[in-house]
């Protein structure tokens, strides 16, 4: 997921000439509701009522020109405050909890008795104005503050030097959904899907709440590799893998652990210099060679597919073709040993193939049409790959559905989107709202399983029967930033061939709250995405005799 920018949306400070009105008795009697988002307390006040901290609707609080000598930690309960004026008081210190008020855009502390500032103020990444004049602060602090863009430099300095508690992440729970079949032959394997957050996207402009040292790739890559190694999946699908890091980090490290891999960068790499090309991100698939053998590998460039299927559609040319996202797919042969002793397919000569597809769709929420069409293009291309693979010598039949599919992706789309509806339900209406009423109808039929001349009844369909491994809100979010928290990463599988035995559950949300983690990356969490991990059970297409009868496929 890419964020447009952080956190510089327009901020309008309170109007100093603000006026108020008192409702009449008649207005009160008629049920008129009062609305006041600002509060001013003045008159040489020395202490504040604890009831003030219950006014959580406040967005502006004026406490200036009083005799306050301390501010209690409970002020952090006013989590909607964007403006706080504590100027011209007698404050000698500030509570560390002030750093939890991450909605603040303006914090005025002028003309107090402050000698030190809590480094927790560095967490106020949305702060645009920090007033510190007239305080006996150390020269080091003042030097930073008085620089051009001093507020930002000072906040960055405090965040980068804020002590991080050494406690480790609590383990994510394994959720068992089904026991493995003990009667019918089956193979079991695990699949990981993980957006590792490419280095060039990990900037303070996008992730201002994360210390710069914890955004640094040299730091983050250790946590990312630790996550991958600890999951120990049989198949790994990664998004946002930088080209250079694939060849210098991921492939060598995983080859040592018995994997082979396939990678393709985004299409822009083709028109770049060799030096620039190193930093283009793309998608990678790794698999354990003791369990799978590579049969085919494919790259799907969405802009090329869009160009070939535009049929004169301006929207297709101007909106879809201009995005250089890609997908990759591999056809694997599943080793017979995975089916266990005495649990092999009926014909020993048969090869059990498996296709694994991995993609990263366009990020912008305003381009729901592009995401949906990219998904359709990818599924259509995977269908072509399957048709070719299914006609290979030794494969069971020419039917694409005879080869099971695992599709991993950062779809940048929520569970209620047209993208997920299309994948889960086998199709989507050609006038779905996600198409934004743009003129795609003719070219969309190129991606329907019925073909351009088939009967689609107003739907764009695909021939796969797919199901998400993470159903029923097993994960409340897969992408966790300050501005956005939601499910946008998925593992789909062929439900005619496979069952889900279990999935890796979510990180304890209470731990995130207790540690004031409002977004990732974080010193303990190296990406803005959480990994997905599932265990799948694969049944071969030809089942053995049970009591003299061939059992039908049960799904």
Swiss-Prot record:
Tissue expression pattern: Highly expressed in placenta, skeletal muscle, pancreas, testis and leukocytes. Weakly expressed in heart, spleen and thymus.
Region of interest (Nuclease domain), residue spans: 158-555
Membrane-spanning intervals of the chain: none
UniProt repeat feature LRR, residue ranges: 57-78, 80-101, 103-125, 126-148
UniProt cross-references to InterPro entries, sorted A to Z: CCR4/nocturin_mRNA_transcr, Deadenylase_CCR4b, Endo/exonu/phosph_ase_sf, Endo/exonuclease/phosphatase, Leu-rich_rpt, Leu-rich_rpt_typical-subtyp, LRR_dom_sf
UniProt family annotation: Belongs to the CCR4/nocturin family.
Gene Ontology cellular component list: CCR4-NOT complex; cytoplasm; cytosol; nucleus
Binding site for substrate: 240, 276, 360, 365, 412, 479, 484
Consequence recorded when altering residue 410 to A: Loss of deadenylase activity
UniProt function note: Has 3'-5' poly(A) exoribonuclease activity for synthetic poly(A) RNA substrate. Catalytic component of the CCR4-NOT complex which is one of the major cellular mRNA deadenylases and is linked to various cellular processes including bulk mRNA degradation, miRNA-mediated repression, translational repression during translational initiation and general transcription regulation. Additional complex functions may be a consequence of its influence on mRNA expression. May be involved in the deadenylation-dependent degradation of mRNAs through the 3'-UTR AU-rich element-mediated mechanism.
Main location: cytoplasm
Keyword tags: Cytoplasm, Exonuclease, Hydrolase, Leucine-rich repeat, Magnesium, Metal-binding, mRNA processing, Nuclease, Nucleus, Repeat, RNA-mediated gene silencing, Transcription, Transcription regulation, Translation regulation
Activation and inhibition: Inhibited by free AMP, and with lesser efficiency also by CMP, GMP, UMP, ATP and neomycin.
Positions bound to Mg(2+) 1: 240
Keyword Cytoplasm: yes
Protein name: CCR4-NOT transcription complex subunit 6-like
Needed cofactors: Mg(2+)
Lineage: Eukaryota, Metazoa, Chordata, Craniata, Vertebrata
Catalytic activity: Exonucleolytic cleavage of poly(A) to 5'-AMP
Residues reported in the UniProt entry to bind Mg(2+) 2: 410
């Amino acid at each position: 997921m890419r964020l447009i920018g952080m956190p510089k949306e327009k901020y309008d400070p309170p109007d100093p000439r603000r006026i108020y009105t008192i409702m009449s008795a008649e207005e009160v009697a008629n049920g008129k509701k009062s609305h006041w988002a600002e509060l001013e307390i003045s008159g040489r006040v020395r202490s504040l009522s604890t009831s003030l901290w219950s006014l959580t609707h406040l967005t502006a609080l004026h406490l200036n020109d009083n005799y306050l000598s301390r501010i209690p930690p409970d002020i952090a309960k006013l989590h909607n405050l964007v403006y706080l004026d504590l100027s011209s008081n007698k404050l000698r210190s500030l509570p560390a909890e002030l750093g939890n008020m991450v909605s603040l855009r303006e914090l005025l502390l002028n003309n107090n008795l402050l000698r030190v500032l809590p480094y927790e103020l560095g967490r106020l990444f949305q702060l645009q104005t920090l007033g510190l004049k007239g305080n006996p602060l150390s020269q080091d602090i003042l030097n930073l503050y008085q620089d051009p863009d001093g507020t930002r430099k000072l906040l960055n300095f405090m965040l980068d030097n804020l002590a991080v508690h050494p406690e480790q992440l609590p383990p994510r729970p394994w959720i068992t959904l089904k026991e493995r079949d003990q009667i019918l032959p089956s193979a079991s394997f695990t699949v990981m899907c993980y957006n590792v957050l490419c280095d060039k996207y990990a900037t303070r402009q996008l992730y201002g709440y994360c210390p710069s040292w914890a955004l640094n790739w040299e730091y983050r890559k250790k946590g990312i590799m630790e996550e991958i190694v600890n999951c120990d999946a049989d198949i790994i699908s990664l998004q946002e893998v930088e080209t250079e890091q694939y060849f210098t980090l991921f492939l060598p490290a995983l080859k040592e652990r018995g994997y082979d891999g396939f990678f393709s960068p985004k299409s822009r790499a083709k028109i770049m210099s060799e030096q620039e090309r190193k930093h283009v991100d793309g998608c990678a698939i790794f698999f354990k060679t003791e369990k799978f053998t590579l049969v085919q590998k494919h790259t799907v460039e969405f802009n090329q597919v869009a160009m070939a299927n535009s049929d004169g559609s301006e929207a297709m040319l101007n909106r879809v073709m201009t995005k250089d996202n890609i997908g990759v797919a591999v056809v694997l042969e599943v080793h017979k040993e995975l089916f266990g002793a005495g649990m092999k397919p009926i014909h020993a000569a048969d090869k059990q193939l498996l296709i694994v597809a991995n993609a990263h769709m366009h990020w912008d929420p305003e381009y729901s049409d592009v995401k949906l069409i990219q998904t359709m293009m990818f599924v259509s291309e995977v269908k072509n790959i399957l048709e070719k693979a299914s006609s290979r010598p030794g494969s069971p039949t020419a039917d694409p559905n005879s080869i099971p599919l695992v599709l991993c992706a950062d779809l940048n789309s929520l569970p209620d989107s047209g993208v997920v509806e299309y994948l889960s339900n086998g199709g989507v209406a050609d006038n779905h709202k996600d198409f934004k009423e743009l003129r795609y109808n003719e070219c969309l039929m190129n991606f329907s399983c019925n073909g351009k001349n088939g009967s689609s009844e107003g739907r764009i369909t695909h021939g796969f029967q797919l199901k998400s491994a993470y159903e029923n809100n097993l994960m409340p979010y897969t992408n966790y930033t300050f501005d956005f928290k939601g499910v946008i990463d998925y593992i789909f599988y062929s439900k005619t061939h496979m069952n889900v035995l279990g999935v890796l559950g979510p990180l304890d949300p209470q731990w995130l709250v207790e540690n004031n983690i409002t977004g990732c990356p974080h010193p303990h969490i190296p990406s803005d995405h959480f990994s997905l991990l599932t265990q799948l059970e694969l049944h071969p297409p030809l089942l053995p005799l049970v009591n003299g009868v061939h059992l039908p496929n049960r799904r």
